[in-house]
Amino acid sequence: MGGNEAQNLAAIQRGFEAFAKGDIETLKTLFSPDANWNQAEAGVLRGNYRGVQALLEFFGQLAHETEGSLRVEVLTMAASGDHVLVFERVTGERKGKTLDTKEALVFKLDSGIVTEVTELQSDYPTAAQFWS
Protein backbone atom coordinates (compact mmCIF):
# COMPACT_ATOMS: atom_id res chain seq x y z
CA MET A 1 0.00 0.00 0.00
CA GLY A 2 0.94 3.63 -0.29
CA GLY A 3 3.84 4.20 -2.63
CA ASN A 4 6.22 6.96 -1.79
CA GLU A 5 5.12 10.38 -0.62
CA ALA A 6 6.71 12.24 -3.56
CA GLN A 7 4.83 9.98 -6.01
CA ASN A 8 1.57 10.58 -4.16
CA LEU A 9 2.06 14.36 -4.06
CA ALA A 10 2.85 14.40 -7.78
CA ALA A 11 -0.32 12.41 -8.55
CA ILE A 12 -2.51 14.81 -6.59
CA GLN A 13 -0.85 17.84 -8.21
CA ARG A 14 -1.56 16.32 -11.65
CA GLY A 15 -5.15 15.83 -10.56
CA PHE A 16 -5.63 19.45 -9.60
CA GLU A 17 -4.06 20.60 -12.86
CA ALA A 18 -6.31 18.24 -14.84
CA PHE A 19 -9.41 19.36 -12.91
CA ALA A 20 -8.64 23.02 -13.63
CA LYS A 21 -8.31 22.29 -17.37
CA GLY A 22 -11.22 19.87 -17.57
CA ASP A 23 -8.80 17.12 -18.63
CA ILE A 24 -11.03 14.08 -18.13
CA GLU A 25 -8.57 11.59 -19.63
CA THR A 26 -5.89 12.45 -17.06
CA LEU A 27 -8.41 12.39 -14.22
CA LYS A 28 -9.48 8.87 -15.22
CA THR A 29 -5.91 7.61 -14.77
CA LEU A 30 -5.54 8.99 -11.25
CA PHE A 31 -8.39 7.10 -9.55
CA SER A 32 -8.72 3.38 -8.86
CA PRO A 33 -11.74 1.75 -10.55
CA ASP A 34 -13.58 1.58 -7.21
CA ALA A 35 -12.35 4.88 -5.74
CA ASN A 36 -14.71 6.49 -3.23
CA TRP A 37 -15.26 10.24 -2.74
CA ASN A 38 -17.10 11.17 0.47
CA GLN A 39 -18.86 14.50 -0.04
CA ALA A 40 -20.14 15.30 3.44
CA GLU A 41 -21.56 18.77 2.89
CA ALA A 42 -25.29 19.34 2.68
CA GLY A 43 -27.09 20.19 -0.49
CA VAL A 44 -27.50 18.76 -3.96
CA LEU A 45 -24.04 17.17 -4.09
CA ARG A 46 -23.99 15.40 -0.73
CA GLY A 47 -23.15 11.71 -0.77
CA ASN A 48 -20.59 9.06 -1.58
CA TYR A 49 -19.42 8.74 -5.15
CA ARG A 50 -17.93 5.32 -5.90
CA GLY A 51 -16.08 4.43 -9.07
CA VAL A 52 -14.38 6.50 -11.74
CA GLN A 53 -17.57 7.14 -13.73
CA ALA A 54 -19.43 8.37 -10.64
CA LEU A 55 -16.51 10.66 -9.78
CA LEU A 56 -16.42 12.12 -13.28
CA GLU A 57 -20.18 12.71 -13.14
CA PHE A 58 -19.72 14.42 -9.76
CA PHE A 59 -17.03 16.72 -11.22
CA GLY A 60 -19.34 17.45 -14.15
CA GLN A 61 -22.17 18.28 -11.78
CA LEU A 62 -19.90 20.73 -9.93
CA ALA A 63 -19.29 22.53 -13.22
CA HIS A 64 -22.96 22.37 -14.21
CA GLU A 65 -24.31 23.63 -10.88
CA THR A 66 -21.91 26.60 -10.90
CA GLU A 67 -22.19 27.25 -14.66
CA GLY A 68 -18.45 26.73 -14.93
CA SER A 69 -17.58 29.36 -12.30
CA LEU A 70 -16.16 26.96 -9.68
CA ARG A 71 -12.46 27.56 -9.03
CA VAL A 72 -10.12 25.69 -6.70
CA GLU A 73 -6.88 27.18 -5.40
CA VAL A 74 -4.51 24.85 -3.57
CA LEU A 75 -3.20 26.65 -0.48
CA THR A 76 -1.03 23.83 0.84
CA MET A 77 -0.42 20.16 0.22
CA ALA A 78 1.32 17.64 2.47
CA ALA A 79 1.93 13.90 2.35
CA SER A 80 2.24 11.37 5.13
CA GLY A 81 2.56 7.73 4.16
CA ASP A 82 -0.32 6.80 1.88
CA HIS A 83 -2.27 10.01 2.55
CA VAL A 84 -2.12 13.47 0.99
CA LEU A 85 -3.84 16.39 2.70
CA VAL A 86 -4.84 19.36 0.57
CA PHE A 87 -6.07 22.63 2.05
CA GLU A 88 -7.82 24.65 -0.64
CA ARG A 89 -9.84 27.76 -1.32
CA VAL A 90 -13.00 27.20 -3.35
CA THR A 91 -14.89 29.99 -5.08
CA GLY A 92 -17.88 30.01 -7.37
CA GLU A 93 -21.34 31.31 -8.08
CA ARG A 94 -24.62 29.45 -8.13
CA LYS A 95 -28.21 30.69 -8.43
CA GLY A 96 -27.29 34.22 -7.33
CA LYS A 97 -25.17 32.99 -4.40
CA THR A 98 -21.41 33.38 -4.05
CA LEU A 99 -19.08 30.83 -2.48
CA ASP A 100 -15.68 31.74 -1.06
CA THR A 101 -14.61 29.16 1.48
CA LYS A 102 -11.80 26.86 2.49
CA GLU A 103 -11.89 23.10 2.75
CA ALA A 104 -9.62 20.14 3.25
CA LEU A 105 -9.41 17.06 1.09
CA VAL A 106 -7.83 13.92 2.49
CA PHE A 107 -6.68 11.60 -0.30
CA LYS A 108 -5.72 7.98 0.33
CA LEU A 109 -3.48 6.51 -2.36
CA ASP A 110 -2.01 3.19 -3.35
CA SER A 111 1.14 3.54 -5.48
CA GLY A 112 0.12 6.98 -6.74
CA ILE A 113 -3.51 6.00 -7.48
CA VAL A 114 -6.33 7.57 -5.46
CA THR A 115 -8.52 5.03 -3.67
CA GLU A 116 -10.47 7.31 -1.33
CA VAL A 117 -11.16 11.01 -0.78
CA THR A 118 -12.82 12.67 2.21
CA GLU A 119 -13.89 16.29 1.85
CA LEU A 120 -14.14 18.44 4.99
CA GLN A 121 -15.58 21.95 5.13
CA SER A 122 -14.07 24.72 7.24
CA ASP A 123 -17.37 26.62 7.12
CA TYR A 124 -20.12 24.04 6.88
CA PRO A 125 -23.07 26.51 7.12
CA THR A 126 -21.73 28.60 4.23
CA ALA A 127 -21.13 25.55 2.04
CA ALA A 128 -24.53 24.08 2.93
CA GLN A 129 -26.30 27.34 2.07
CA PHE A 130 -24.46 27.65 -1.24
CA TRP A 131 -25.22 24.09 -2.38
CA SER A 132 -28.85 23.99 -1.12
Language model segments and positions:
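Short, low-complexity N-terminal intrinsically disordered segments enriched in polar/charged residues
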Residues: 1-33, 128-132
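A solvent-exposed, acidic/Ser-Thr-rich amphipathic alpha-helical stretch
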Residues: 28, 32-79
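Short, solvent-exposed coil/turn segments at beta-strand boundaries
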Residues: 34, 79-83, 107-115
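Short beta-strand segments that buttress and anchor functional surface loops
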Residues: 61-62, 86-93
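Beta-strand elements of well-folded, non-transmembrane domains
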Residues: 20, 92-94, 111
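A short, polar/proline- and glycine-enriched secondary-structure boundary/capping micro-motif
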Residues: 48, 96-99, 126-131
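Short beta-strand edge/turn micro-motifs at domain boundaries
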Residues: 105-128
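Hydrophobic/aromatic beta-strand elements that line small-molecule binding cavities or substrate pockets
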Residues: 72-77, 89-91, 102-107, 118
